[in-house]
Design a protein with these regions (language model features):
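Membrane-embedded segments
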Residues: 86-90, 96
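Bacterial N-terminal signal peptides that target proteins for export
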Residues: 1-10
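Charged, glycine-interspersed solvent-exposed loop segments at helix/strand-loop junctions
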Residues: 73, 141-207
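Short, glycine-/small-residue-enriched flexible loop/hinge segments at domain edges that mediate gating
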Residues: 70-87, 101-107
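STAS-typified acidic loop motif
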Residues: 28-60
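Glycine-rich beta-to-alpha active-site loop
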Residues: 80, 96-141
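Terminal peptide-recognition signature
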Residues: 49, 74, 118, 196
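C-terminal motif of bacterial Sec signal peptides marking the signal peptidase cleavage site
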Residues: 20-22
Length: 207
């Protein structure tokens, strides 16, 4: 499955989940998932975030914090993932360094690397019906096979980049291992409110 198809699958899965949920929200979900590189729309003290986190995102976030010093929070409306892990973690660290709040709004959808970015918020809020999706990472092995994060021994150095990031964000290490086991890379696990609270992803509880 190519990256755009997977992003679409994540978005459709979230919409199906919303229609089956007992949660009733006034806001409607975006009509289309954001396949383009992540962008921010500024309204006063709020930056609304849409799109896939990629190699351009650190520069975009740096411009955001430098050129819009009044912005205090990022509302992640539709952030279905990332296609560059180091860039994602770099951009996330910029958010934490500035002390910004991150918010998943009602019917907002974030997944995969988007959840990593969310954890960078100094204060983190998930509004009613906001959706957080996680799964294992994967990479191509030397023989052309796919290596899944859940299959790599826990003491392997490949995990270090993510574990160090979560330590910096004060997110328990158990969350990283949970994401690897929750779903394979081709699928997505939509976190329950209980899981969101258990792993410390919100600072004020799920609204």
């Amino acid at each position: 499955m190519d990256s755009q198809s997977f992003v679409k699958a994540i978005f459709v899965s979230a919409l199906v989940m919303a229609t089956q949920s007992s949660c009733i929200c006034e806001r409607t979900a975006p009509k289309e998932p954001s396949f383009e590189a992540a962008v921010f729309e500024i309204e006063g003290e709020t930056a609304f975030m849409y799109g896939v986190i990629d190699h351009t995102t650190p520069g975009v976030v740096r411009a955001l914090v430098d050129e819009h010093p009044d912005v205090t929070r990022i509302v992640m409306v539709d952030v279905p993932g990332s296609d560059d892990d180091p860039a994602n973690l770099e951009a996330s660290r910029l958010v934490r360094a500035r002390g910004l709040e991150t918010v998943v709004p009602s019917n907002g959808v974030i997944a995969s690397g988007g959840v990593d970015f969310f954890t960078a918020g100094k204060n983190r809020v998930v509004e009613p019906c906001g959706k957080l999706g996680v799964h294992s990472w994967d990479e191509d092995g030397p023989d052309g096979s796919i290596i899944f994060g859940s299959e790599v021994p826990r003491d392997h150095e490949i995990h270090a980049m993510f574990l160090e990031f979560y330590r910096e964000m004060e997110i328990p290490e158990d969350f990283y291992w949970f994401t690897l086991e929750a779903a394979p890379s081709q699928r997505i696990h939509w976190m329950s409110n209980e899981e969101i609270v258990l792993y410390g992803l919100v600072t004020e509880g799920v609204q």
